[in-house]
């Protein structure tokens, strides 16, 4: 009877389609965060160019940084991203067009040196986030005590109190319509989980969040620099996962899940740079980024196998909604010594707990109100520190180094909340820790152009949970990856 109960409720989980919701705090922080990306020079110096400026990619962080230009510039960048392993049939390496932009300078022909010196206009495309990530994890801490089915049982029992059954995939069918489940029935239409000996999990994510910025900047007296950028964004995020659990009753069930999000959005970025001492190259910068306002579309589905036999599939309908990222604030410092050395430092802050979901018409439904409350409870402010330096032993050759620290957006003991009326059959989540990025690079200048190379290594560890149980110990995982990139540029 246990096997038949498992079969029927699992079928309910994946075969009943609905156009309900799939968003939560884990997806929210995923869409709001950024990689270190841009030109190879920008990456090699850790992105710490907010006060130094002079790079096409800086319009995405401090729009005033393009005001440092005195000649026009065009650049295009390519990279290879390497995660070291594949999953779900996807490779662990991808080639990518990461950046392409142009900056046009207009000399105001003001020989006095006072007042407006240059007005610069530019446009730049780059990848804000590359979602390439692969995971393969053996879960060996269940010990005949824990199971995903206990979490499902809790959802079932909650839903029974509301005269619904089916949980996770759909709650629109009456519990009296079907009398079965993957769980042991308690005799009063309630459910209890079945302990598991072990489990296996595999996941692959891919796609990108790309941005295109249009920038305008001003150089006033070679001492004050102002800039603004308008950014448009395009999200294409894909997730595929596989979960297999072997119960103490000898039965094995498999879920293969897929989830896709597409969306577009826009923001405005404002920046200012000042050289407070006219005779000194020291400068500081200030930036404000508005939230990015997105319109998103989600779709997801699942396949079910029981003891290696195909059972059923289910695809949930598309659902449109709106999503708003946090405000972001930044300060930066920069200094140069002659034409041979430059150093920059930058700090950014965004409060992840202020992210917000809503219906397409802006209405804050009960579901989204609950998700927004969960975001406030489980996420926190995120701090980013960037430092970078450049050394030129000769005019044509540059050596660069950089470092980033990005704090975790998760509060201690954060967990994924799955509504009994949501479409998820994915119960897994990872509380990712701090990010450390290390960068190196070199550049070669020649008449009319340049070639830059950069290497980036990103290290991050996390606590992985296949499902939520207060007593379940996490499995340690990592998201380490490396990137090699090249930029080809032209000055005119």
Regions found by a protein language model. Give the residues of each.
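Bacterial Sec-dependent N-terminal signal peptides
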Residues: 1-26, 488
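Outer-membrane beta-barrel porins/channels
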Residues: 23-37, 42-43, 105-492
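Short secondary-structure boundary/capping segments within folded domains
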Residues: 34, 49-51, 57-58, 63-71, ...
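Predominantly transmembrane beta-strands of Gram-negative outer membrane beta-barrel pores used
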Residues: 44-47, 60-66, 73-79, 98-106, ...
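Transmembrane beta-strand segments of Gram-negative outer membrane beta-barrel proteins
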Residues: 24-49, 67-84
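Asp/Glu-centered strand-loop micro-motifs enriched in Gly/Pro and often flanked by an aromatic residue
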Residues: 43-57, 87-89, 199-205
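Strand-loop-strand
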Residues: 81, 90-91, 435-437
